[in-house]
Design a protein with these regions (language model features):
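Helix N-cap motif at beta-to-alpha junctions
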Residues: 8-11, 46-51
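Amphipathic, hydrophobic secondary-structure cores in small proteins
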Residues: 1, 26-46
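Intrinsically disordered, low-complexity boundary segments flanking structured domains
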Residues: 13, 30-33, 55-58
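C-terminal structural segments of small proteins and small subunits
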Residues: 51-83
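Generic alpha-helical hydrophobic packing signal
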Residues: 16, 39-41, 59, 63-64
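Short amphipathic alpha-helix segments
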Residues: 9-25
């Protein structure tokens, strides 16, 4: 799974809504604490790297900053991905 991290639920939900007619499953979640530490942020969770890149591109087009892209490597273990 891939996690695209946003600073607020407003940004995460806004971008998710741009993909509401997409067949891919996109979920808004609280960012796992192993990624966010103590900060309150939200992420879009997707299965494929390609879909994550598509979401990042849409975020950039709409002027919505992301805090990072992470790949879940094991249960509750994450690696930051350069995009």
């Amino acid at each position: 799974m891939y996690y695209i991290v946003y600073s607020s639920i407003t940004f995460a939900t806004g971008i998710k809504n741009k993909f509401r007619y997409d067949s891919a499953r996109i979920t808004v979640i609280h960012t796992p604490s192993k990624i966010s530490g103590a900060s309150c942020s939200y992420s879009l969770k997707v299965k494929s790297y390609e879909k994550a890149l598509e979401i990042i591109k849409a975020s950039e087009e709409y002027g919505v900053a992301i805090r990072g892209l992470y790949k879940e490597t094991a249960e509750n273990e994450f690696e930051e991905i350069t995009y």
